[in-house]
């Protein structure tokens, strides 16, 4: 199939050498506009990023944006049922760093979730979700500023692998028959009309995630890494996640037992400070992030727990509208708006573009362009502090000025 993508005349590819990015002064970065409110938030993000790069580097650096397609727009460009073209996957692999708006879930069979499909096809095994408070953001908790965590959610395993069979299907009956007759399973309460699923959790998948979390804690001078799990109930999956995490910390980072264990301390080779490696049961953790958020820092968890935790934490600091996220693998990274497509607001220039703008800030940091990233944070803090905000914040603030989506982007630029 001929290419449907226009490659910019100016710009060069980001390359990878020995696991490190080589970022040219004028990188080509693919972006997916996204469905629904993607038409509003993505243009605002592009404008903010361009302004930050221009202000930080005075024209010496510039991003050449290249639109690629997934979701509803892809079906218009590639054909009726082409939601995730092979060309899109190839270009993300080739150009190493990309960013996307929100994507709809295709109606009917085939791909269950485009977001999950992108993560799995590209082996983006880390879902990275930093959660911090921006001064002035309306929050339901008394001290949102105490929440400052970075979540490493395992992206490739757990029940998100999508290995499940519908109740009353021949496949479900076959699996249940095998479990009962071959494996001696007696605990399926109602086997006659029962959907069934499988939860994979591997040593390799766990260790590469926990390794990345500890490396992040070292590089960013963080105090602790917490393994969150339900190992008290699921001993051989969630419990194994905890055990393999501790094992990796001992074997690769010289972790030493604290008071007989299981908690460990790891010395940060850059600062000499100790990083505590600890674990907590998932339901207790969801209590603790409300009661004692300051005690937690870098979080490593399996896929489902990570989904719950990152959204719960986002609400604590002011909602999913400004929660950034990234999906990172060894070969490439895809930064994303973490909210849905909100089709009823599409094209109204109304919604908060903060999530994809702060995801772009993460992207710039990933590229090593920290000066431009810092300007976006400064601009976001300034706009929110000045109470110049979109409708989702304006209705919760006293004396705020209501801005459109595009105007909020402009306010971020003005506050840089």
From Swiss-Prot:
Gene Ontology cellular-component terms for this entry are: cytoplasm; cytosol
Characterize the regulation of its activity: Inhibition of this enzyme by phosphorylation regulates the branch point between the Krebs cycle and the glyoxylate bypass, which is an alternate route that accumulates carbon for biosynthesis when acetate is the sole carbon source for growth.
Protein EC:
1.1.1.42
Q: Does the entry feature the keyword NADP, yes or no?
A: yes
Q: Which residues bind Mg(2+)?
A: 307
Q: Which domain of life is it from?
A: Bacteria
> What does the record's cofactor remark say about binding?
Binds 1 Mg(2+) or Mn(2+) ion per subunit. Both Mn(2+) and Mg(2+) can be used, but Mn(2+) is 10-fold more effective than Mg(2+) in vitro at the same concentration.
Which cofactors is this protein said to need?
Answer: Mg(2+); Mn(2+)
Enumerate the UniProt keywords alphabetically: Acetylation, Glyoxylate bypass, Magnesium, Manganese, Metal-binding, NADP, Oxidoreductase, Phosphoprotein, Tricarboxylic acid cycle
Site feature Critical for catalysis: at which residues? 160, 230
PTM-bearing positions, type Phosphoserine: 113
Biological role: Catalyzes the oxidative decarboxylation of isocitrate to 2-oxoglutarate and carbon dioxide with the concomitant reduction of NADP(+).
- What is this protein's name? Isocitrate dehydrogenase [NADP]
Name the gene for this chain: icd
